[in-house]
Amino acid sequence: MEEKKTGTTTVGIKVKEGVVLAADTQASLGNMVETLNIRKILPITDRIAITTAGSVGDVQALARMLEAQARYYQFTWGRPMTTRAMANLLSNILNENKWFPYMVQIIIGGYVDKPELASVDALGGLVFEKYTATGSGSPFAIAIIEDGYREDMSIEEAKELAVRAVKTAGKRDVYTGERKVQVVVITKDGMKEEFVEFKE
């Protein structure tokens, strides 16, 4: 059976004001575009979200687990789980299943007590970063981010950089959509989602 290629580009940028997550909205299977309107950034709480690259079913199952754990933590301890704690939990879940892995590559970002951003691979490898990218278009996206990132940039500048990175990846990677970018901005004031569309 021939393996079908899927792809995407998701990025995360952390600045002093918060975290920006961005992703294309195209879902592909092999050489076919399944849809141009899929959400690849999933909220876990009102202050933490993950980006999805890899098996859709695996990501959805992990998101449900994280949501349940976050609710349980809040109920038990009376305070929200931090982004760092949730990233470590996700890393442990993935590592425990390394012999039958979830086929995912995830960026987790949030602002609970401070902005935090991390990437987690399918075996649970966890790295906290200032910026990162995942998916088939990530080499193109990360080049744009590395060229434009500054630690003192505003959240609005970070958003513009993230959108540009995903759009550039879409121009070079056939498995990444370039018509629309989903953007989630998380600050001390909460989470906001928007879609940036481009004319063909």
UniProtKB/Swiss-Prot annotation:
Chief location category: cytoplasm
Subcellular compartments: Cytoplasm
Description of activity control: The formation of the proteasomal ATPase PAN-20S proteasome complex, via the docking of the C-termini of PAN into the intersubunit pockets in the alpha-rings, triggers opening of the gate for substrate entry. Interconversion between the open-gate and close-gate conformations leads to a dynamic regulation of the 20S proteasome proteolysis activity.
A Pfam family per the record: Proteasome
S-S bonds: none
Active site: T8
SUPFAM superfamilies from the UniProt entry: N-terminal nucleophile aminohydrolases (Ntn hydrolases)
Propeptide residues, chain positions: 1-7
Oligomer and partners: The 20S proteasome core is composed of 14 alpha and 14 beta subunits that assemble into four stacked heptameric rings, resulting in a barrel-shaped structure. The two inner rings, each composed of seven catalytic beta subunits, are sandwiched by two outer rings, each composed of seven alpha subunits. The catalytic chamber with the active sites is on the inside of the barrel. Has a gated structure, the ends of the cylinder being occluded by the N-termini of the alpha-subunits. Is capped at one or both ends by the proteasome regulatory ATPase, PAN.
PANTHER family: ATP-DEPENDENT PROTEASE SUBUNIT HSLV, METALLOPROTEASE TLDD
Protein's name according to its UniProt entry: Proteasome subunit beta 2
Organism: Thermococcus gammatolerans (strain DSM 15229 / JCM 11827 / EJ3)
Lineage: Archaea, Methanobacteriati, Methanobacteriota, Thermococci, Thermococcales
